[in-house]
A protein has these predicted regions:
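Short amphipathic alpha-helix that is part of the acyltransferase structural core
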Residues: 1-32
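Active-site rim helix/loop that mediates acceptor-substrate recognition in acyltransferases
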Residues: 24-50
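Conserved beta-strand in the GNAT
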Residues: 47, 53-62, 80, 85
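A conserved beta-strand-loop-helix scaffold within acyl/acetyltransferase catalytic domains
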Residues: 58-74
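Conserved acetyl-CoA binding element of GNAT-fold acetyltransferases
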Residues: 72-88, 142
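Conserved acetyl-CoA-binding loop-helix of GNAT-fold acetyltransferases
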Residues: 86, 92-105
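Conserved beta-strand-loop-alpha-helix junction that forms the acyl-donor binding cleft
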Residues: 116-127, 145-149
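Conserved acetyl-CoA-binding loop of GNAT-fold acetyltransferases
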Residues: 131-142
Length: 153
């Protein structure tokens, strides 16, 4: 397996959109919809590949904090992960961990002090285990919801 930062081109864009459609069809994240060109283009793209097959991807971008929060001071540059996805048949193989670690080392070498992300998974126990226990992230906040009325079909 190879982990690397990729340049976006039309072929890669199509592959990433197709992978995001698979993610959407899994129905594992609240409100997730497949990506469009506009969702992907402003981001740096990192891939995990086995031969010619993309096994997983991570994309995100660098920003500066607009205001001081309990975690980060105003003006501090950070890398925000927009998406991290691994194909279902390749989960629990360490691909997500390797993608995250690769990006962590890359942005750290560029002088960034933080990686930040939000997640919208239906399995919060697994995602907290991955990000907090395995990747060493601190838990900053949570946004919970309770649906009061079921959608009518």
């Amino acid at each position: 397996m190879r982990i690397y930062e990729a340049e976006l081109n039309d072929e890669l864009l199509k592959k990433l959109i197709d992978l995001s459609a698979k993610w959407e069809n899994e129905d594992i994240s609240y409100g997730y919809r497949k990506n469009s060109r506009e969702d992907i283009e402003p981001n740096r793209i990192f891939l995990a590949a086995g031969g010619d097959e993309i096994l997983g991807y991570l994309f995100g971008h660098t920003e500066k904090a607009e205001r001081t929060s309990s975690v980060i001071n105003e003006g501090t540059p950070f890398f925000e992960i927009e998406e991290l996805y691994v194909l279902p048949d390749h989960r629990s193989e360490g691909i997500g961990r390797e993608l995250f670690s690769f990006v962590e080392q890359k942005v750290k070498s560029e002088g960034l002090e933080y990686i930040i992300l939000s997640t919208s998974t239906k399995d919060f126990n697994s995602i907290l285990h991955f990000y907090a226990d395995i990747m060493g992230m601190d838990f900053g906040n949570a946004r919970l919801f309770k649906r009061l009325n079921q959608a009518k079909n």
